[in-house]
Design a protein with these regions (language model features):
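N-terminal capping/lid subdomain adjacent to the active-site entrance of alpha/beta enzymes
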Residues: 2-208, 212-221, 225-229, 256, ...
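Right-handed parallel beta-helix/beta-solenoid
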Residues: 216, 242-243
Length: 459
């Protein structure tokens, strides 16, 4: 049997097991007999530390609390901001009614853990009857980027100060893994920056880079060859476009450079759009692997999907990736406490495995050694959080997996009030970023326009 056919057989078994777990969760949730009696929706405007390049100085979030008639409260991040519509959809219904799965989002997982009286990761670890250990803490990669000053003129990170800034967050939080967001400058400037940062942090700190699929294949190859001596952990999808183009470029670059490539789009397919079950809905369990693409390309060394796919979908995805000998990671979007918590729970039960002491010859389905990577996170860049106790604390660059039932975190009413969204606050941030965008190409030293031609400078 060829390797892809073997993978397909293994994947069918994995999906069958995941669907059996999904059905058990659904049955246990419905049998608990809860009814949603109240829904509270909160809009929040959370500032970044500094201003995230020309993107913005704050981000808008929507949270919801779903309270049941038995006194449990499930929390969701990324909820429907239309409180009236959300209440109309869910009030009076069982939170595990399949018709409202998309409305529940993250709260679905928070509530099932609370009903089971288990931290979510432990609950899922038990349902899958895993023999591998359950992690108590998860290594995090510190996301970094060029920062313009915030509204108070503070917390800038420039090309010149970037290496000392990285040294500072390593000293403060113990990070052992740094991620460089790399669409702020033109590609050639990043060669110098990576060399400077590697010299500043030494050889013990892992460095990964992400051009956000903003480069051409030739640009990516030139960069990769010039920084090979820096021993990067990975470069994430340097080339964009249609998935077929991303996969083809990744495949070619892997043959031309020793730097590993990470992808959150490989293995295909991963997520269906739009997702009928909403965020964390595990829709990808119903999508078959693209066997033609798997036979045609090998575009990545590390598979790092988004947690939005759902815990069961990621379990399936990671098992398939490891079957093919890929490393595994987890991509980051913009997450505050509740969404960070589920990422920690997913990593805690899906990532760990027992490394063999000796080489294993011919053993079926033996996972490759050293395949688990620190997970991406924007979390270190937020000014605060809206969970009780504030931001989770880093310890040697790790975050502890929350120990309470469900997600193990709760929303803090005071912080929700302090960071409540208002048009006035949003307008101030909008004015600030518009001023930056008017001059950002000059500030960042760009020689070309965003369209690619040399800049025409008016006299």
């Amino acid at each position: 049997m060829d390797p892809i056919a073997e993978l397909a057989k293994f994947d069918r078994e994995t999906v069958a097991q995941a669907k059996a777990v999904e059905q058990r969760i659904q049955a246990e949730g419905l049998a608990a007999g809860h009814t949603i009696r109240d829904v509270r929706v909160f809009r929040v405007l959370m500032p970044w530390v500094g201003t995230k390049r020309w993107d913005g100085s704050a981000e808008n979030f929507t949270f919801a609390e779903f309270e049941t008639d038995k006194g449990l409260v499930g929390i969701a991040e990324g909820a429907n901001a239309d409180a009236k519509e959300l209440k109309g959809n869910v009030l009076g219904k069982n939170p595990f009614d399949p018709s409202i799965r998309a409305d529940m989002g993250l709260a679905y997982w928070d509530l099932i853990g609370k009903i089971a009286d288990r931290p979510l990761g432990q609950y899922l670890h038990e349902l899958f009857a895993l023999e591998t250990p359950l992690a108590e803490r998860v290594p995090m990669s510190a996301y970094t980027w060029y920062r313009f000053p915030d509204l108070n003129g503070e917390n800038a990170v420039t090309f010149e100060s970037y290496p000392s800034y990285v040294q500072e967050i390593i000293r403060t939080h113990g990070f052992q893994n740094i991620k460089l967001s790399m669409c702020d400058f033109e590609p050639q400037h990043y060669v110098e920056l990576v060399l400077n940062i590697r010299a500043a942090v030494g050889s013990d700190v892992d460095i990964r880079v992400d051009p956000h699929a903003s480069w051409g294949e030739a640009q990516a190859l030139r960069f990769m060859r010039e920084v090979e001596d820096c021993h990067l952990e990975w470069i994430e999808e340097p080339v964009g476009g249609r998935f077929a183009h991303i996969f083809r470029a990744g495949h070619r670059l892997r043959l031309l450079s020793t730097i590993p490539i990470s992808s959150h789009a490989w293995l295909p397919p991963l997520v269906s759009h739009p997702s009928p079950k909403g965020r964390y809905g595990d829709d990808a369990l119903d999508a078959e692997l693209d066997l033609d693409a798997l036979r045609r390309w090998q575009p990545a060394d590390i598979s790092a999907p988004d947690a939005y796919a759902g815990p069961l979908a990621l379990k399936r995805h990671y098992d398939a990736a490891r079957f093919l000998g890929l490393g595994i990671g987890m991509h980051s979007a913009y997450e505050l406490g509740p969404a960070t918590a589920i990422r920690l729970h997913i990593a805690a039960f899906t990532f760990p495995y027992e490394m063999p002491y000796h080489i294993v010859w011919g053993r079926d389905r033996a996972f490759p050694p050293f395949s688990a990577h620190a997970i991406d996170a924007h979390y270190n860049q937020w000014a605060d959080d809206v969970i009780c106790g504030g931001k989770m604390a880093y310890d040697q660059g790790f975050l502890a997996v929350p120990k309470g039932p469900g997600l193990g975190v709760e929303l803090d009413p005071e912080r929700l009030r302090h960071y409540a969204f208002s048009e006035e606050k949003a307008a101030a941030h909008t004015r600030h970023i518009e001023q930056i965008r008017a001059t950002h190409l000059d500030a960042l030293g760009w020689r070309v326009e965003r369209g690619g031609w040399r800049r025409y400078r008016r006299r």
